[in-house]
Amino acid sequence: MSTDDPIAEVEATVARARAAQQAFEAGGSQLLYDRAAQAVAWAIMEPDHNRILAELAVETTGLGNVPDKITKNHRKTLGLMRDIQHVPTYGVIKDDADTGITEIARPIGVIGAVVPSTNPGATPANNIINALKCGNSIVVSPSPKGVPTCEALLGYIYAEFDKLGIDRDLVQMIPGRGSKEKTQRLLEVSDLIVVTGSQNNVKRAYTSGTPALAVGAGNVAVIVDETADLTAAAQKIAASKTFDNATSCSSENAIVVVDAIYDAFVVEMAKSGGALITDDQRIIDKLWVKGHLNPCAIARNADELIAALGLTDDVPAGTQFIAVETKGIGPDFPLSGEKLSRVLTVYRASDFDDAVETTRKIQLHQGAGHSVGIHTAAQDRPLTLANAIPTSRVIVNQAHTFATGGAFNNGMPFSLSMGCGSWGGNLSLIHI
């Protein structure tokens, strides 16, 4: 095989993964699959490894911040391991005497995983754990900027595998620097594809001829109504919005605040570090450059964002995020979409019904099928919202980023990849 032939390199990598998987399955047991998954979990959760991976991710991608990536790597992996701990994935997993139906778990084969630069450590680790838990092998295709982090992660995984005598070829990544051509070939020759990231990659996966699990676009909108605990709502929104510099697809991109408590909520939001800007065009002119999000603003720390937006002399010291009043929704109003930054769009609604309609319009523009939220004390309103909006999840009185992808204080399963159902152009709405 010539190293000058990138397609042949991918095919050879998948061939090694397939041979390793077949041996893994032939000698398989629940204990073996579980130990392989546990080895990967420890490879990323070990404190020194976690810190190094977080630092490397921020250094090479320029996205997010180290403390929050450390938290994310640990929390998402620990939560996933809790969720799958007692799930049977080998042999007979159910034998129903009443129906005469026996269910047997069988591996799929080689999983191809496309992962984003926003989570170059946590997402591949979670994909790898899920693959091994079910007796599969996996080949990861990281974003170009995520390659160093993925390489380091695999190095830690291999060290754990060597201790257990597990074949390294069960977990591989596309060799060398990633490219569209290499990723496309991986999509074509894998047995199942898992895609987290850009909608372009999702579309390519769905047209590759290989079964695919993929995610939809996020653009979370959250209602704050007149019955809400305003202090708690502001604190939760601030914590969620700023976590890892808003790299999560579950980060609030817009809040819709009912008029009766609008001014009071703005005061509470300011106490939690949110500075309100009423000139939306000023933000638009800085946040987008030639139709694209400004790389100097996206996923940056607060001081970097504020400087990029030209607001250094216009916001209070200690400002953690920028809240921007606006009215428009749709393609001609960029603030109504996903911003991947500490910028939060603020809509003012006349009442709850108007807030629901505004949220519906936002989701129809972008983010349908993903998730919305509400801060309220009215027991009936979350259900009203759920029945009115094209969404797969309604998060109630919680910090959205922490709740949507799984939490230890709610029933959502842990994941970094949210299926968005047919509304979001996906096969399923499950947490992948």
Where do the protein language model's features map onto the residues?
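Flexible, glycine/charged-enriched surface loops at secondary-structure junctions
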Residues: A26-D34, R51-A54, D167-L170, N245-C249, ...
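Short, well-ordered beta-strand elements within core beta-sheets of diverse protein domains
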Residues: R18-A26, G112, A254-V257, L340-D351, ...
